[in-house]
Amino acid sequence: MSPLSDSKRSIVALALIFCSGGSFLFAQEQSATPASDQRDLFERAVAQAESTAAISHQLKDIFQRTAKAVVKIHGVDEHSEICGTGFFIDPTGTLYTAYTVGGEAGNFTIEFGGKKYPARQLLADIRSGTAMLKIDAATPTLSIGKSEELGVASPVVAIGYPLDLPETPNCGMVAGFDQKYLGRYFSTTHLRVNLPTQRGEAGAPLLNMKGEVVGIVVSRLENTSACYAVPIEAAEKIRSDFVRFGEARHGWVGINVSEAAQPVEGSRAEMTQIMDDTPAARSGIKPGDILLQVGRKRVTQPEDVLNASFFITAGDTVPIIVMRGDQRMIFHVQATLHPASRTGVMVASPATPLNQAIPLSLGSEVPRTP
């Protein structure tokens, strides 16, 4: 973006001085300020004006490029009408949304491009808190980014349909990466974002400053101006399962971990139980082994096992790296289907953080926790 012209710089800078520093002008009458100080004030005002203009331009560009791929979703469940947000992820009409929007409702209608389309559910996964719907139309798409590149204070943008209003951008920043909430564990690390959300914004895409999707808004924190978003990698894992198998296949190896007394190779995740007749038991992993890595995910504390385990797919062989004494060992374990996937029970005791999930409701009076 080209810099502001000298005349515009002066106008904007003076406007800022008048708006935010009226007392300064009054003080000028009381005591003279050196010309160098006046110049410094002017330059700071100019820099602030240029920075504000640049941010405004960037946000406007992101909204204009991405809003056309963000849609309003209507559905009906056994209690009431559901209204939420979704976004297209391929040019053939496939879209992501939150489980609270597309998971348990039916008779979906998508508002897109000034028209309404019937939609069908492809997949609903309560563990990730996401759902996939599809319409029969050619559609724009959003680019997929990497939530792993975000840090605390990274700026983000959500685009949704709050309170049945037109598409609306909402700007905030990443406040944290949480593995649990109120003592209960998420199935995978969630992004806590300083974004106030309203009814209708569940399923909204969370975008980085490149306009790439890095998360999906799935829940709001009551009595706060914050929300949770599931990382886009979690939704992509579920999508990959669907492409391969037609369903989500959450893997499981059958281990319990707790915090070791001392770190070993940077990890405090100690195997405390190897469940009988499980992939881990058959592989040779033993209690007392210190877990270093599951698949591609590094483990440094017991809670990391939740995030690593989420990305295991049943039927796949997963490399698991451990320390046994002073020996580094690699086990290739073929994961089986997670017991919760068979029983439908997705939330376990807070004392045993084993692949729990909290599909918190957002803007809905109907409890969604199973």
Question: Predicted regions span which residues?
Answer:
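Conserved active-site neighborhood of the chymotrypsin/trypsin-like protease fold
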Residues: K72-C83, F88-T168, H190, P196-R199, ...
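Bacterial N-terminal signal peptides that target proteins for export
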Residues: S2-V12
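Short, conserved catalytic or interaction motifs in soluble domains
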Residues: Y161, Q179, A204, D276, ...
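Active-site region of chymotrypsin-like
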Residues: A69, V76, A131-S143, T168-S225, ...
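N-terminal activation segment of mature serine protease catalytic domains
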Residues: Q28-F88, T94-Y99, N107, T130, ...
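Short, glycine-anchored, charge-dense loop/turn motifs used at functional sites
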Residues: T92-T94, M209-V213, G288
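Bacterial N-terminal signal peptides
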Residues: A13-S23
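C-terminal recognition in membrane/secretory proteostasis and scaffolding
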Residues: S23-R39, D61, Y96, G114-Q121, ...
